[in-house]
């Protein structure tokens, strides 16, 4: 059951969102990388690669993503589509990043290469299969699993799919200094699902938006439904309020 929020909580969350959803937010955030490249297909590809390593230490994943951007020469979409990544991500068991070895990341990029070669862009792939965020997540998890990639993209939409939810926010929210909104014409922002980052979960409990700290897809959807009381038609504006405050604390 979705809790009814007091007006004071609604006002506080709206104020926090306005404070944190600024251009400054991208500094030290994985969303920064998609703003460093040009062209819709390239921004989309850069964003998808950036989300794939966006966990653990910010210093570490920002550095790893920068190395991938440098290797691509600023053209991530072509770099993947042409298979140039094999030169720096060989299929061996050496560590690539934290829990990922080279073989895992190579298979992830190879599956993405297949998608690009078959469909042109990820947006073109999803717009024929998705009308909301959940169906987009289901299509992506299914495609990567079916094409031999495991351990980076979740195998289904039962987990929180935190990074995919963040990626879909980037792609689907228009009119934002942070998010690009490239897919706003086929994924309505009202359908986006809250990325269940540890900061978001903690602040949600503090504000009484969640009763416990367990993170599942059903929990993420309940939190999103609650945020619709605060931001009608744009629940993930609340992501900036909760995440921004959590990082600041």
Regions found by a protein language model. Name each.
Residues 1-249:
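HhH-family (HhH-GPD) DNA N-glycosylase catalytic core used in base-excision repair
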């Amino acid at each position: 059951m979705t809790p009814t929020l007091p007006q004071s909580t609604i006002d506080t969350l709206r104020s926090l969102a306005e404070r944190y959803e600024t251009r400054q937010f991208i500094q030290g955030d994985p969303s920064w990388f998609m703003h460093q490249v040009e062209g819709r297909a390239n921004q989309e590809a850069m964003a998808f690669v950036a989300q794939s390593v966006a966990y653990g230490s910010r210093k570490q994943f920002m550095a790893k993503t920068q190395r991938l951007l440098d290797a691509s020469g600023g053209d991530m979409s072509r770099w993947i589509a042409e298979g140039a990544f094999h030169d720096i991500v060989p299929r061996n068991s050496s560590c690539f990043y934290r829990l990922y070895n080279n073989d895992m990341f190579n298979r992830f990029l190879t599956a993405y290469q297949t998608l690009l070669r078959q469909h042109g862009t990820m947006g073109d792939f999803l717009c024929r299969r998705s009308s909301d965020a959940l169906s987009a997540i289901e299509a992506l998890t299914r495609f990567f699993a079916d094409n031999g990639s495991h351990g980076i993209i979740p195998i289904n939409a039962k987990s929180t799919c935190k990074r995919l939810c963040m990626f879909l926010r980037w792609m689907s929210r228009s009119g934002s200094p942070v998010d690009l909104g490239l897919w706003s014409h086929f994924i309505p922002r009202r359908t986006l699902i809250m990325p269940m980052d540890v900061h978001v979960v903690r602040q949600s409990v503090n504000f009484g938006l969640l009763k416990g700290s367990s993170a599942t897809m059903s929990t993420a959807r309940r939190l999103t439904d609650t945020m619709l009381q605060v931001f009608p038609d744009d629940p993930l504006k609340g992501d900036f309020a909760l995440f921004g405050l959590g990082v600041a604390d």
